[in-house]
Amino acid sequence: MSWKCSSYEFDTRMPVIMGILNVTPDSFSDGGMHASADAAIEHALRMVEEGAHIIDVGGESTRPGAAPVAVEEELARTVEVVRALADQGICVSIDTRHAEVARACVEAGASVINDVSGFRDPAMVEVARACDAGLVVMHMKGEPATMQDDPVYDDVVNEVRDYLADQARMLEEAGVSRERICLDPGPGFGKTAKQTRELMLNLHELARLGYPLMVAVSRKSYLGVLYGIENPLERDDVSAEESLAAVELGASIVRTHNVARTAAALRNLRPYCFVALGCNVALVGNPGEEQEAKIAQLSQAIGDLSMLPDSQLIDVSSFYDTEPAYLEDQDRFVNAVALIRTGIGPHDLLAYLHAIENKYGRVRTVRNGPRTCDLDILDYQCYVCDDEKLTLPHPRLTERDFTVKPLLEIRPGHVLADGTPVTPDGVTLGWANKIERHA
């Protein structure tokens, strides 16, 4: 998946770092530090040297309780800084809620509009439609001055996900191309520390929407509550670790005050890996309950995946009822796809998967024949190989409905390590239907 931002295009299979440049006197952690144009530009260039791909310029504080800034004042703070950085070949983002500011900064060279109000203003939508900048659509309950006044949700994850999906759909219907849109769940914006924590632990649910996902937790107050760190300037280490955890769950754009510390943390990012699971031989089960027995076997195998060393189970698709492929004279399959993050190399991981298969009685006497448990590596982040033991990406992934459908369920728009997009267009066999299960 890529994120198109004017003349820039970012491959979101790897983290993209957005450095925060507040040209404000009252931001919650660095207000006044970069208020002059010279100081702001110097700090931006330092962040680029430290690894920032984008510089996010903000001229209005959106901290809880912040007073609004007049548009004229916000323009005076931001436009010349944006122009100076863009003239040096830097991808610049303008962090603003105001259409006049967004328009002026895009004209000055900004390649991203980062709107904390989520493009609720029709005038901002018109600015977005009329340009080719990348767009960051954020969720915020209320306005900065009042957003922390007792925010209430029935289900914070579902409500934020649905809001972001609706806003993205609205932008597309207004004429904005999908590849320009990035989503930001807005940690700490109209959310308690507990609500924000729940949201951040379930980012994989937002990644299922199929847009690049931003994580913007840097120095946020909820981290102060969770870790007992009162001074925002002392939250950089936990901010970096929280950002790393968010990227492992599916975020791809990291907005941060401390670029160097964040870049260092992201070097510990474990590769993602998609694992296909299949079964058409139930080991136990009463007549008529074979499908549930197959699901149970795959569920146990998924549990085994979650126990792999230096690994984390991130997401699992629904189960799919599948017609046999290649060898058609056999029982129907149940299939699924799991997404993991792992520090295990691909060839060693294959050995672990074979051990799980063997645990459930897998035999390999008939090619493409019946199996109690079948685990295949479909795609391993940034890794391409073709040797006697392993070929990656899986050479038959894109022709099989039973791998394409579940993979796209959990990561719409996924692009394989060799650059091949996963789409339904090349599917020719192994037709699959989602199994509807009710709690």
Task: Name each model-derived stretch.
Residues C5, T12, S29-D38, E42-H43, ...:
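Active-site-adjacent loop and "lid" segments of alpha/beta metabolic enzymes
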Residues E42-G58, L249-G250:
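Catalytic domains of carbohydrate-active enzymes, especially glycoside hydrolases
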Residues S61-A66, I314-R341:
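Short, charge-patterned binding micro-sites
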Residues P271-S311, S317-D321:
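N-terminal beta1-alpha1 ligand-phosphate binding loop
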Residues M1-W3, P15-V16, P271-F274:
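Extreme N-terminal starter segment of soluble prokaryotic enzymes
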Residues A325-F333, H347-L350, H354-A439:
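Flexible, gly/pro- and Lys/Arg-enriched active-site loops
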Residues S177-R180:
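Short acidic capping loops at alpha-helix termini that bridge into adjacent secondary structure
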